[in-house]
Amino acid sequence: TVCGHRRDLSAVDAQAVLALCRGNQVKWELRLSYNLLVRGEGEDLVIVQLSPPPGPVAVTPGQPAAFGEWTVTLGAEPGEGDSYPVSLPEKASLTVTSWKSADRMTLPDSRGPRSLKRLCADAGFRPWQRDALPVLRVDGIPAAVPGVGADAAFAPQPGGPAVFVTFTKEDGNEQ
């Protein structure tokens, strides 16, 4: 049971833990899905529930918004980090949240919408990394995710208004 709900770890997670348990390392640490951290020290195995991702955070153009280890900004110029040009409707509700299983995005030049889970996997994110990613939402719809891209529905039109959404990871480490 994770966070009061029955959850199944993936076979990949289980295989990774078993491989580390059977290995020669005396101390090791592995992050898994559902904000779980597994630590091995000698013959001891400890599973820790990490803090969940933060709840929704409102985003205002020109003001940085903190989301876990990430800072999300909307500005006139691209910033340091992953920046994507987007066209935002006036008076839209702008928030940053974690991903949801129903999220779908259509990336530019793609053949149609795909699940955010699949897009994150294709971008090389492990499940625990995906769980910590900020998702910029426009009126609740996923618009941009660092390392994945911006939804084609929010692509600026030539000569039209645009802002840049920039995602910066605080610790400076790659995902």
Describe the residue ranges of each PLM region.
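AMP-forming adenylation/ATP pyrophosphatase catalytic core
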Residues: T1-Q175
